[in-house]
């Protein structure tokens, strides 16, 4: 989470939604300061914010979950930075790599699992993430697929005059994956059950080649019930990790005043 007292805005960084790149730019260009954890949610901010801070302009980024799941799979498969095998990053040591992450990582590598095998093994219930716990409290939501323009618009709405373009926006747009290469007909029915309620809620389409898609009522009901329980758990029972990120990360260096 980033807060700027000069421009009176709060940026809520959601995972796998360019949060590091945006946080860095807000810090360097708009006097944005790290606030709580990198991925702290609005209800956490609300508990500690002053009355004045609660009036700040709040924004976040929403990304298609079908893209997020592919991105996570590819990151685990490549493990290019060694994150999933670095004990310093494990959640029990204060990092962000959970036991569930490692279970998925091991499944992919032990079985040389394709995306379809990975998806069928781990994605059964309707998908939901921190977006549902956050976006209702936002004054503006940047759509990841339109990040370059929406980032500028968010800053303009917060009162920034002539905001600078996000440096990684064009690079991010160029990374867009062909989802049809991952979501094959083999997993079509499961994909609809898993993503249908979330995509409907946030106006995302399924693959065009699939034509008209009908989301099962059972998935919609599960999404609603599990979403409610998740909100209650996050707000009242979830034990939050340390607010200080590890050294060498963008947010961790920002917290230590060492980001240039």
Briefly describe each language-model feature range:
Residues 1-260:
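Membrane-interface amphipathic segments in extracytoplasmic regions
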């Amino acid at each position: 989470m980033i807060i700027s007292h000069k421009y009176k805005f709060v940026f809520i960084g959601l995972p796998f939604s360019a949060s590091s790149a945006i946080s860095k730019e807000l810090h360097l260009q708009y006097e944005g300061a790290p606030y709580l954890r990198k991925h702290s949610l609005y209800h956490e901010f609300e508990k500690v914010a002053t009355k004045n801070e609660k009036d700040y302009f709040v924004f976040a980024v929403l990304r298609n979950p079908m893209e997020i799941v592919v991105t996570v799979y590819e990151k685990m498969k490549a493990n290019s930075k060694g994150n999933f095998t670095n004990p310093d990053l494990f959640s029990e040591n204060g990092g962000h790599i959970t036991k569930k992450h490692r279970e998925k990582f091991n499944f992919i590598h032990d079985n040389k699992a394709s995306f379809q095998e990975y998806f069928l093994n781990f994605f059964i219930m309707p998908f939901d993430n921190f977006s549902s716990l956050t976006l209702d409290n936002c004054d503006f939501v940047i759509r990841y697929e339109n990040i370059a323009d929406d980032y500028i618009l968010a800053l303009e709405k917060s009162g920034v005059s002539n905001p600078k373009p996000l440096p990684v926006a064009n690079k991010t747009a160029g990374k867009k994956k062909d989802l049809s290469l991952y979501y094959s007909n083999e997993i079509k029915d499961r994909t609809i059950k898993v993503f249908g309620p979330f995509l409907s809620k946030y106006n995302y389409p399924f693959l065009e080649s699939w034509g008209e898609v009908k989301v099962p009522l059972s998935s919609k009901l599960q999404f609603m019930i599990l979403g409610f329980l998740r909100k209650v758990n996050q707000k009242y029972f979830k034990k939050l990790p340390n607010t200080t990120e590890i050294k060498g990360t963008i947010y961790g260096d920002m917290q230590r005043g060492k980001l240039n």
